[in-house]
A protein has these predicted regions:
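Conserved small/polar residues in nucleotide/adenosyl-binding loops
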Residues: 144-151
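Conserved glycine-rich cofactor-binding loop
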Residues: 16-17
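A hydrophobic alpha-helix adjacent to the NAD(P)-binding/active-site core of NAD(P)-dependent oxidoreductases
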Residues: 54, 98, 106-107
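Conserved NAD(P)H cofactor-binding loop of Rossmann-fold oxidoreductase domains
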Residues: 86-91
Length: 155
């Protein structure tokens, strides 16, 4: 189900659960044209059943990022008021226990995926002389030792 009413369009990444899911639902209630993205198709379908516009977006995959961006423009009529970069993941384990490859994979998603999507979105926002790019990062409140995903907050 696609909502076509003219509203401020917001693309939100990582809407399968947690903050992304709740932000998408609440902004939709407030009247924004939400495009909720998720990596897995089953999550996209779950979001669509709620009445949200939803696209599949895997931040590790350039083709997926580009396809989701194009679908977002089709849904929104070519404009985008905001990008809410929320989709990410944390690799469990103590920093000293994680390999370079594991951390590289995490940075690929949590930094480079966001960057690639943002570089696609900015020209659309500049054309309209308005827009917002929001980066969200969260970590659990307490840990007994530093986890790899906590290092993202140090960057």
């Amino acid at each position: 189900m696609q909502k076509t009413k003219e509203k401020r369009a917001i693309l939100i990444t990582g809407c399968s659960s947690g903050i992304g899911y709740h932000v998408a639902v609440e902004l939709d209630k407030l009247g924004y044209q939400v495009i909720a993205s998720a990596r897995k198709m089953q999550d996209v379908q779950k979001l669509q059943k709620l009445g949200l516009n939803s696209v599949q977006l895997d931040l590790d995959d350039t083709e997926s990022i580009r396809n989701a961006f194009q679908q977002t423009l089709e849904i929104s009529g070519g404009s985008l008021y905001a990008l809410f970069n929320n989709g990410a993941y944390g690799q469990p384990g103590a920093v000293e226990d994680l390999s370079r490859e594991t951390l590289r994979a995490q940075l690929e998603t949590n930094l480079l995926g966001w960057h690639e999507l943002t570089t696609l979105v900015l020209p659309v926002m500049r054309e309209k002389s308005e827009g917002r790019v929001i980066y969200n990062s969260s970590i659990p409140v307490s840990y007994t030792h530093l986890r790899a995903h906590e290092t993202n907050d140090l960057i």
